[in-house]
């Protein structure tokens, strides 16, 4: 459960992300593909090379979805219901991949926001991404 302090931290961090959400999403995906090569199996139709338009496009989707989740932190299941359905029923993504992408997102944010990425912000973002992951895998059961 996200505390009021967590919510404040998450909103403050996401305000710093701002218009870079898509770029950071794409960078996190690239990190995930490089660090965890098995995740590439879900993107056989993508050009996974550095800076590819397809990775950038999917990174924007990731960034937009997270922005939507930040805006609806008090109703993550409602805000992410369609994405949960898509990943569980159509794409059939292994739930562990959400944790891997979350880790890569944290690394990416730490690289781009070193002054703002305090231990408290890190902890709040980690809890938030874990909550998002939990919602995304909720339809698997």
Curated annotation (Swiss-Prot):
Heme b binds at residue 87. One of its GO terms (cellular component) is hemoglobin complex. One of its GO terms (molecular function) is organic acid binding. The modification Phosphotyrosine is found at residue 24. It comes from the Eukaryota. The modification Phosphothreonine is found at residues 8, 108, 134. Residues 1-141 form the Globin domain. Pfam families: Globin. The keyword Transferase does not apply. The modification Phosphoserine is found at residues 3, 35, 49, 102, 124, 131, 138. Red blood cells. Keywords: Acetylation, Heme, Iron, Metal-binding, Oxygen transport, Phosphoprotein, Transport. The modification N6-acetyllysine is found at residue 16. O2 binds at residue 58. The modification N6-succinyllysine is found at residues 7, 11, 16, 40. CDD domains: Hb-alpha-like (cd08927). One of its GO terms (biological process) is hydrogen peroxide catabolic process. Involved in oxygen transport from the lung to the various peripheral tissues. Belongs to the globin family. Heterotetramer of two alpha chains and two beta chains. This is Hemoglobin subunit alpha. The gene is HBA.
């Amino acid at each position: 459960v996200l505390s009021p302090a967590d919510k404040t931290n998450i909103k403050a961090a996401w305000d710093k992300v701002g218009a870079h959400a898509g770029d950071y999403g794409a960078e996190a995906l690239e990190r995930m593909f490089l660090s965890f090569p098995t995740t590439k199996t879900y993107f056989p139709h993508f050009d996974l090379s550095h800076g590819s338009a397809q990775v950038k496009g999917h990174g924007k989707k990731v960034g937009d979805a997270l922005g939507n989740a930040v805006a609806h932190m008090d109703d993550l299941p409602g805000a992410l219901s369609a994405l949960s359905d898509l990943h569980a029923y159509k794409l059939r993504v292994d739930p562990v991949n959400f944790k891997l992408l979350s880790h890569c997102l944290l690394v990416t944010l730490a690289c781009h926001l070193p002054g703002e990425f305090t231990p408290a912000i890190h902890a709040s973002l980690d809890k938030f991404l874990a909550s998002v992951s939990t919602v995304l895998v909720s339809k698997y059961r």
